[in-house]
From Swiss-Prot:
Residues 346-358, 876-890 have a biased composition (Polar residues). It holds the Pfam family F-box-like. It comes from the Eukaryota. F-box protein probably involved in ubiquitin conjugation pathway. This is F-box protein COS111.
Amino acid sequence: MQSVNIVSTNYSRYGVSVYDRLYRKDKNVSAKHRPSSTGVYGHDASTVDHASRSNNNLNLTRSTSAISESDDVATISTNNSRRSVIKRKYKSLITASSKKLITKLYEHGSNSDSFSIFSHKTSQSHHPAQRLGTEEDLIINDLFKRKEISDLPDEVLRNILSNVKDDQRTLVNCLYVNKAFYNATKPTLYERPKFTSTYRVAQFVTSIRTNPQNGLYVRELDLSKLKNGSLNGKSTSNTGVVADSPDVDEYNPMRTRTGSVTSFTSVTSTANSNTALSITTNNKDVALAGWRDWRYRHDPLYSSPVLNSYNAKRTVSRAPSIKSSHSSSSLTLFPGLKSKESFAQLSEGKSSDNGNNGKRQRSNSSVSSITNSLMSSLYNGSHISLNTTLSGSDNNSSKTQSKGKSSSSPGNPNDSSGEQDSIISSSSQIDTNTFGMTSSKSTSSTSNWFRMKLHGNGTRKLRLRSNKAISSKKDEQQNEESAQTAQKIETPIIKRTEPFSTPHPYTNKFLLKYAQYKDLPLGYILHILDHCPYLYILDLSNLTLCTDFEIIEGRRYKGRKQRFGSSRALPVVQESVISTDVPNDLDVIYLTDSSKTYEYYDRLRNTNKHKRSSSSNNLWSIPNQGWSDAPAPIGSHKNDLRRTHSQTIGRSNVELRKLNASEIFEHIATNQKSAYNTHLRVYMKNVLWCTQDMVKSFVLENFDQQAENLGEDKSSEMFIHDMNFSFENSGLNRNFVWTCEGNLQEFIAMVVLDEVNRKDDLEIENLFNIKAERILTPTNGPERAPEVHYISNVFTVSYGFQSNKKREMKFRVTILKTDTPMYFSIKKLADDYTSVVIKLQTNKNVALHGSETADIITTDQGSVLPEDVPEDNNADDTNNGENTIAQPFSNDPKERIERITQEIVARLKDLRGSDLRRNIGENNYVRERFLL
């Protein structure tokens, strides 16, 4: 690094450029750039100059005595002497780095922006420094500086934003404030997502699969309010936005670069009357998109915006008006143009008769009408007419060309002749007339233009001459045309960075038949449960599941992007070849993750089963193969060919496994974190895919995870009280015992008692030791306490989500007598079994339909409770000294437990009475034979 030579102690002059004072040829420049007599801090300029000279007197020669002390440069007589004196006087400045700096200053000039630091210092050094205040004021401002809300910690911002957690629109807007708000809002927004559209749920699944860290924020998920795609009581306008729809964001998609709404007018009044298309609920041809539209988002047939239901309906309604308007304009311009012969006659300057037309040909107006309708359907806002756009640009071009003609000089070799200008003007007018503008020229110019188009030689010559004429003025005309066109026609731009700038899309017309469904594929639910381990509140009420399959490969290779030739190793990963974006590069785990259908994978599976390796040598026998995937010719690489061919065959070994709804319960019970699993809340109301075995396995699996904590301390029993489930009105039979809402302890009691109640009489006799010979044997059971009514042996309850992975859990049921209301508890008294203790009120019997005991129907699927029954006021208040109360059907789990217990006790009484009668009969028979 070059050393710095300090030539003066006046630091205020360091920013002043010395180039103008020392090296400019004009001597008066130094006077202009000389600083004022008073410096920045009040010192005299002559004093500063004198000090500067005194510090450098060792570097000066005797020739400096001839220079006046009042001025450093102005007293030099000639240029030669001035330069030599300057070199000697400022020798300390003439270093290697200084020479380079002076050269750059000379090249760029003193006012160049390349050295903005010098120019900034120069402009600021001439002005005195303005102090902001005293030191006390500065200290006070530093100490009492106001803090902004963005300076708060993230934890405090999260607590503030949690007050608006129910307003998702406000939370989304907070993401766009700054980085601090983004970091604080993101966990709050993902904590409780809410959805009413299956399309948004599919997007959410792709989002958490692409960014797994977002799934860690999810705590609650409510899918009970999903709606179908039908427009219920809502109408759509030409802006493409559904009014009063919670799923559709209110915005205007047609915005200009400045943010104003762009308005476009149609060519004719007929087209203008049909621009606004109103679609009501009576029209079933328009619906909002669902998860199937998101699944086929990369398919060119289903993802085309032209083919969605709204644009397709609008295109059909606008096509007749556009066709009529353009056909009228074309007939006005070319009244005799109806066939090929008339077209040829028109090119020769003749007119054709209206009669004797052999075939009707498609005119340019019909083609333009179709193109116009398709292009205008790309926009969901105001109808953009191609006629207006193109005609405006053509008018500007014609004006520019005429202006260039008048300003051209005859001596210019690049100047065009009069014939050329007439051709350019006629061609521009023909283009204008083609798009519906009125013509001011005669029919002769039109015929000349057609004749020029028909004859190739003339066309080539005219194009060459026209290109020479336009080449000299091409840049000027292009700039002028773009400026004039931008004033009249503003390009519509949608601001994607704004929140809620994208409305809810419409479904494809080929997927319109699924608009009435509000189902979700089973694979999406499993993806959510896998990527949201801290989810502890899940609401799947009113949800319909769509059949889904898991794709299983027979051979798995390490590495997702391993290729053989131009193909991927697995057909699962082969889906990501379609697009290069990140969401499409995800692994295909379930069938709904891919845009391929079931038939595709089934055909891929059957190909490997029915076709041998010899038959696979044919290129067409391998599904989804192209010429680029064909192996290399047989030659020196024969071994590589065989290896690639064998791997291609193994790649087709694909199996499909149908998913079961029980896997939802399995994922909830096994994939959740233990810290949040203790507070788990699952709601599955009004669902048909929930069965008895699913609920039993789900309840026992959660209890097994918490069973090791039971019995250690009393506080651990509170864990099972915090886990709540709801299965109201679920299952094919909605009157099962478990179709209610309660905590884990209540469901365990209902499941165990229901398991006992489902046994036959012989099993119950063995379970509760009803037979006399077993009662007389003291070794078969423990001694009974006086308050013990019935006690069972230890029995096992099998459960499991899969038939080949069944597990067992041991229980013992104890029924005690009490005069207080019913109470139950679940305790783990030993390591090998769990005790279910029920204290039953003995002086109370639950009677339905006037019966003595509860009328509970026992089936193979479990105990079924009867429907609601009104109270029987005519029933006797006393029945053998016991109160009989007729109670209606209730969703209270404690009442259900009491009813099942009463049913078990009633069956035990009947079995004991029959056994007693049988024993009495046997005793009488033995006594009679003994007497005889």
